[in-house]
Amino acid sequence: MLMNLKLFHMALIALLIQASPVWAVEAGKPLPDLGLAEVQKTKGQYIYIDFWASWCGPCRQSFPWMNALQAKLGPKGLKVVAVNVDAKRADADKFLSHTPAQFTIAYDPQGESAKKLAIKTMPTSMLVSPEGRVLFVHSGFRAEETLQLEARISAAMGN
């Protein structure tokens, strides 16, 4: 019995370590080349990059906020780019038919960009400076945090 409990605790710890968000990119460091034309096109601008998947409930909740964020801060120099990592484009298209995006969508069906950043949680987002430096990384989406997140983005942009 004690041995089973010990094995359970070891398995739980291993699971928690694996599930914890670990980013290959950190605030203040350059964003690596993600191999996405939609991100490359935004060089020289502030970019809010969001990684999402069609099966992710919090991702669905974040889209109206990102639409509003693009509308509000786009004229001040922010470009929102949401990177879909679904293996099937049809899954992303179905999601977008119910939850439209008024910002740029990039498709990465192999998930290579998320792998480069060691992203483990959906959604995960980051703000990147015009110089290509990651300003911060944010994991998950909670509606009650949107005002703080928007304030953080605005402050980083000097607005």
Question: Where is each model-derived feature located?
Answer:
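Conserved redox-active cysteine motifs that mediate thiol-disulfide chemistry
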Residues: 51-68
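Bacterial N-terminal signal peptides
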Residues: 10-19
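Sec/Tat signal peptide C-region and signal peptidase I cleavage site
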Residues: 20-24
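Thiol-/selenol-based redox modules, centered on thioredoxin-like
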Residues: 127-159
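A short beta-strand-turn-helix
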Residues: 27-47
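Short pre-active-site segment immediately N-terminal to redox-active cysteine/selenocysteine motifs
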Residues: 45-47, 51-55, 121
